[in-house]
Curated annotation (Swiss-Prot):
Non-neuronal microtubule-associated protein. Promotes microtubule assembly. Tau/MAP repeats lie at residues 896-926, 965-995, 996-1026, 1027-1058. This is Microtubule-associated protein 4. Testis, striated and cardiac muscle. Its main location: cytoplasm. It comes from Mus musculus (Mouse). GO terms for molecular function: microtubule binding. Residues 254-265, 728-741, 761-774, 1093-1104 have a biased composition (Low complexity).
Amino acid sequence: MADLSLVDALTEPPPEIEGEIKRDFMAALEAEPYDDIVGETVEKTEFIPLLDGDEKTGNSESKKKPCLDTSQVEGIPSSKPTLLANGDHGMEGNNTAGSPTDFLEERVDYPDYQSSQNWPEDASFCFQPQQVLDTDQAEPFNEHRDDGLADLLFVSSGPTNASAFTERDNPSEDSYGMLPCDSFASTAVVSQEWSVGAPNSPCSESCVSPEVTIETLQPATELSKAAEVESVKEQLPAKALETMAEQTTDVVHSPSTDTTPGPDTEAALAKDIEEITKPDVILANVTQPSTESDMFLAQDMELLTGTEAAHANNIILPTEPDESSTKDVAPPMEEEIVPGNDTTSPKETETTLPIKMDLAPPEDVLLTKETELAPAKGMVSLSEIEEALAKNDESSAEIPVAQETVVSETEVVLATEVVLPSDPITTLTKDVTLPLEAERPLVTDMTPSLETEMTLGKETAPPTETNLGMAKDMSPLPESEVTLGKDVVILPETKVAEFNNVTPLSEEEVTSVKDMSPSAETEAPLAKNADLHSGTELIVDNSMAPASDLALPLETKVATVPIKDKGTVQTEEKPREDSQLASMQHKGQSTVPPCTASPEPVKAAEQMSTLPIDAPSPLENLEQKETPGSQPSEPCSGVSRQEEAKAAVGVTGNDITTPPNKEPPPSPEKKAKPLATTQPAKTSTSKAKTQPTSLPKQPAPTTSGGLNKKPMSLASGSVPAAPHKRPAAATATARPSTLPARDVKPKPITEAKVAEKRTSPSKPSSAPALKPGPKTTPTVSKATSPSTLVSTGPSSRSPATTLPKRPTSIKTEGKPADVKRMTAKSASADLSRSKTTSASSVKRNTTPTGAAPPAGMTSTRVKPMSAPSRSSGALSVDKKPTSTKPSSSAPRVSRLATTVSAPDLKSVRSKVGSTENIKHQPGGGRAKVEKKTEAATTAGKPEPNAVTKAAGSIASAQKPPAGKVQIVSKKVSYSHIQSKCGSKDNIKHVPGGGNVQIQNKKVDISKVSSKCGSKANIKHKPGGGDVKIESQKLNFKEKAQAKVGSLDNVGHLPAGGAVKTEGGGSEALPCPGPPAGEEPVIPEAAPDAGAPTSASGLSGHTTLSGGGDQREPQTLDSQIQETSI
């Protein structure tokens, strides 16, 4: 009666369904068991009525439970017990005991039963109806057992109980995490129970009379079970052994513990279950069968125990569908379980089947989970074991299988992690990583390079993250530049498709550009000779590239594309640079620039190292990789540094960007020297030439800082643009340089800061430029070289318009200075023309400075800048002179830039992690402001300089403290996290206690294991029962196989036909054509009583079609069998 009470408790949610189901099951069970009783002695005949009855009842059930059909698929694996749970299971139980075809029949039935089985799954929500079914089933089982308990007891104990317990199972799944284990173990156990039922069926027959006693014993049994329930509660993690006791007790216990232990025990059990599933299957097979045998033998309570044991089994099976519903794993589990059914010798191999069912479902569960884990890693939470397995599988199997996918996912994850800092960098990381992947396929070192690049990409992304953190306040400038960097990266990625070899350079050079300044330090002295070796340095850098895994493939790529484009440009430029460098060195300005260049690079390296310190380690690897292109640019940067020292124009935006604050005074002086020397123009020309390729790289940031500004304002020298056109043609190079700009962002961050100072210094620098201004000839030369730079800007712009985008923010800042410088340098008479253009261009640039965030805007503006500069080669030169007059307007623009950028720069500085270096830079900026102020006085433009001073000093003063404060806040946050960890430590102790409790449960399990001792004996009995069943099944299999062949009408029929051909050649033909053969065979169907088994198998297929068809195939089978016989 405990079932009734439990049913009452459980039936409360869906009593209507329970009533209907009860009616259906009662009618089906009552109607079917009669057929079963009739066929008990001859199991084959039982199968036939079962098929009919199952069709009827199953169809009615399916009609009743059509909605559950969706879960039927999930219920398929547990379809055997589900069929039993559906109430047809009693018949199926007999069928199971009868022959393996029962499983086929069960399949046939359980398609309908799937709905019914799914109904129990739905009943998982409606636990009562299932248990009501248990009660009803127990009653029909009592009836059936009265009729013939041999099979029904087994069925009731196994399948019937499975149905009843399936009812429990759904709640018990909720209440028991064990059910997943049980689902595996009980799945095997159910088959074993069935096998046990067959041998036990006689015992169960002996239990028939105890059945009544059992019902009376049920209260006492329930009492003992209640006692067990307590122990079981402790034993809930006890897995299958406890699960059997629990499940028996769970019938009573489930209502109270339906949902209580569920999640935790499910989680823990699911873990251990999946791990131990196979052993648990064995244990559960041993324990549960033994439990069942205990229920059969040790307990006359078999009705309850068997039913509850069946519940446990069904719990297991429903848990499988439940797990399938939860994990979507059940369908494969079910399918594999179905194959277990397909092995019509489930009784023979029931021990195997339990293992198969258990192993296959767990594997499917794990595989499915792993597969799900692959798509949804969050699924790992289903079970930590699955997490470990899925992780190992994902890392070992899925990564090998889908290395690219996992890598892409990992990179995506990395990108996502990067996303946390900033989406732009996330895009950069993703795009960079993906291009790396695209490149990696090209490179045979895909996987290592993937990981290396992954790591590099990761590290690169975090530096950018830091840069973002630093640039977040700068966001108007750096973020827009980051967005521009994104676009720039995207363009290189597009070119990754176009220039897979070139793009690696671009991306790698991007990173190299980041650390360019540090390497520039070394190359600063090298820059003199490096200009000559720029092309060679590409190769040398390639040799350096091996430092990173990508270096090797990149070496080839660097040598291939950059040397082609850059080498071509640089080859042409090298002679010029060589002559110019020689002239520069002869004039001794090189001596000044070397010192200046080296300190600048050092400062730049310091700033870069400070900002990129997070990035440099990965970036240094990339630097070494990218250095092939980056170093040539660095030689240029070295030259440009010299030129920077000579001209604060910020030709090499990289070094100038970083050091202009520190070097502004020498830069104007140096500018004066270059102006006086006229070779600065050549040097700048060499820069422009060398930098056309590398310029976009370093200047990518530098360009953002100075070069683009120059090119923008310099935009003169359409002829010098020709060499740039080559880089433009080698847009890959320009874009790679654009990518460097992206990676250089750390610098742009610095540059952003420097840009403020630069913006302010740019005015003084324009003032120093004004000083040399009288030297129009050198100015013109520089203008020409800047025109080359300008062409470089356009070339890089046209390919990497996005590059100007980022630089635009910085460019705008630097442009006023550049424009002023250029104006001072080129005081040509075309001022009137250039004024409008340069003023508008400068204003545009200034607007981008304030409005740097709109990358498209800035790029468009930058383009117009370069467009007028290009369109007016002479006019662009004139622009520069034009700027001489408008230089006042340019200072105004710079004022606007400083005013607009000052707050942004402040925010940037505050966020910049390397605020200390920035502090130094602001200091340098202040010095620049002063000297520039003097230069400005010389230029007659002290006001903008003063404004720049005030803005730069204020911004610089504000920057360091803000950065410090942020750092402190981070530290505080860490301390808080630590305190939380302290609480976690306490939590650790709590789990320890939980573990100890689990151990106690294990001790309870040991107690249960003592019970299992008797169960172990029972195990031997089921084993014998299995053997006996197997022998019977073998006989049935032979017949059923031929019949099954007719059922399959595919493989078995032809095979059987061949055999039949031997027996009777005439029938061989009908056999191959089962449909044709079936009709003539129909009359012969009657002779074989065994035909029903095959008929049941046929009906398994035919059940859906209809009873009449089932009978015909049966007759066909009978003929075939007769022929074979």
